[in-house]
Swiss-Prot record:
GO terms for biological process: exon-exon junction complex disassembly; mRNA transport; nuclear-transcribed mRNA catabolic process, nonsense-mediated decay; positive regulation of gene expression; regulation of translation. A motif (Nuclear export signal) lies at residues 195-200. This is Partner of Y14 and mago. Pfam families: Mago-bind (PF09282). Keywords: Cytoplasm, mRNA transport, Nonsense-mediated mRNA decay, Nucleus, RNA-binding, Translation regulation, Transport. The gene is PYM.
Length: 204
């Protein structure tokens, strides 16, 4: 064992004598079985295989570059500038406005909840607005002698619309869900039909 180490020392001394400029010697390393490897002379400019930079194509380099920059079209925000007094004032105004609109929205939601139960009454209110005939006409009284042909046509159109809306509402809603106002409209349906017939006869 001692002779081997002596031999290694001699070999190292010989190699170091013959070294050229920039060369170096890698000392002997021990194998797993306990024996020593030979000392290695390393020429100048040599880089070990595992330290050599691997070749990368242009595409892979571009991918890496793009990944570091973020998605296409992305521009990082520049450093934020200190806000002026006017900008701060404007921000406060915006916040107040947003709070006011949020409060209004909350109050309107509360109101809409109460209006939700009255959604069935919308058609009824439309029919009230279309009320054209007076009580005398409904009872079968003769229309005003001064009415022109255009007035009669308008009345006929209005009555047809009222009848159509009432019939549509009658089909949509069940009889048990009706409120008194709707029941009244349905009871007037036959009277409106009679009035319409009378007006159509008169127009003819």
């Amino acid at each position: 064992m001692g002779s081997r180490s002596g031999e290694q020392g001699k070999r190292m001394a010989e190699l170091s004598k013959n070294l050229k400029e920039g060369e170096r010697i890698l000392e002997p390393t021990r194998r797993p079985d306990g024996t020593l490897r030979k000392p290695i002379r390393i020429r100048p400019g040599y880089t070990p295989e595992d330290e050599v930079v691997k070749y990368q194509s242009k595409g892979s380099l571009m991918k890496k570059e793009m990944a570091s920059q973020g998605p296409p079209g992305y521009e990082p925000d520049p450093a934020p500038k200190p806000k002026t007094k006017a900008a701060k004032r404007n921000e406060r105004k915006k916040e107040k406005r947003l709070q006011a609109t949020a409060e209004k929205a909350n109050s309107s939601e509360d109101g809409s909840a109460s209006n939700g139960s009255q959604s069935v009454n919308v058609l009824a209110s439309e029919m009230e607005a279309l009320d054209v005939s007076s009580n005398n006409d409904v009872c079968g009284g003769a229309p005003n002698p001064g009415t022109t042909g255009e007035d009669v046509e308008k009345r006929i159109r209005a009555l047809k619309k009222k009848i159509r809306l009432t019939e549509a509402q009658q089909q949509k809603t069940a009889s048990r869900d009706l409120n008194p106002e709707q029941l009244e409209k349905f009871s007037k349906l036959e009277e409106w039909r009679q009035e319409l017939k009378a007006l159509e006869d008169k127009a003819a």
